[in-house]
Amino acid sequence: MERPELPIGLPEDIEEKKTAARNWFEGLRDTICASFEALEDELQGPLSDQEPGRFVAKDWSREEGAGGGGRMSMMEGRVFEKVGVHTSTVHGEFSPDFSAQIPGAKEDPRFWASGISLIAHPVNPNVPAVHMNTRMVVTSSRWFGGGADLTPVLSRRRTQEDEDSQLFHKAMEIACRNHAVADYDAYKAWCDDYFFLKHRNEPRGIGGIFYDWLHSSEEAGGWNADFAFTRDVGRAFAMVYPKIVRSNFNKLWTEADRDEQLIRRGRYVEFNLLYDRGTIFGLKTGGNVESILSSLPPVVRWP
């Protein structure tokens, strides 16, 4: 989807709106971390004799000359081989070349951005990998973006008919259908198009939703409507993914399953380093490199 021209100008209470968004993202982070630790405790299948994992939080600040920072929350456990749930709130100025690519930045290079980003790589190949992020960005305009997508690592489960796929799609559809400012069909198609490895001519996973530059008019509800939808995307993810994990994490797997998982993880690496918009944005704006690249899986194999 082509980047739209967004209206220039900010509401008088933009600082209060920034605070509300930041508080939401950080609260969602804490909710998800607690939920994932509960999954670590509940495991009864393979590897249940190992200690359950716990998140380790690490706060970071941007280097001198830039503003803001964030928190990395990483866990390595018996359910999640590697999972990161990160929040950040940063501000500064875009470089001249990057300003031309960002709505509202040509007029003024200053920006503010806050959001949550999550990628989970489970131990059990029967449990699909997942990605979710939502964010608010302010330049001389303002907008929300984000989404969630599911990546089954076993080819027999990587279909639209699979029960995990249907459950995930339904959760995202409900989150969209409940808000007039959202367009489920467009966001689903955008996700399919975005999470596609062009050099391999194949999708990364089974999709989900993806949206960006959400800036509704005041007649349509404005910032409040956009924020309400973005919150429901986070709530939908926090509800549906633990259900999918619980339905799969006690199943047995084979060495062949593990090999397939590691090869599929390689597709994650390729996408994140070649195409991922969040990775590019973070590196271009002086973000925390350790946090940005923590989305990469811990063990990968290429055939």
Curated annotation (Swiss-Prot):
UniProt-annotated site: Important for dimerization, residues: H199
Catalytic activity: coproporphyrinogen III + O2 + 2 H(+) = protoporphyrinogen IX + 2 CO2 + 2 H2O
Metal-binding recorded as keyword: yes
Annotated HAMAP family: Coprogen_oxidas (MF_00333)
Name of the gene encoding the protein in the UniProt record: hemF
Cofactor: a divalent metal cation
Pathway stated in the Swiss-Prot or TrEMBL entry: Porphyrin-containing compound metabolism; protoporphyrin-IX biosynthesis; protoporphyrinogen-IX from coproporphyrinogen-III (O2 route): step 1/1
Name by which UniProt lists this protein: Oxygen-dependent coproporphyrinogen-III oxidase
Originating species: Rhizobium etli (strain ATCC 51251 / DSM 11541 / JCM 21823 / NBRC 15573 / CFN 42)
Stretches the record annotates as Important for dimerization: 268-303
EC number in record: 1.3.3.3
Listed GO biological process terms: protoporphyrinogen IX biosynthetic process
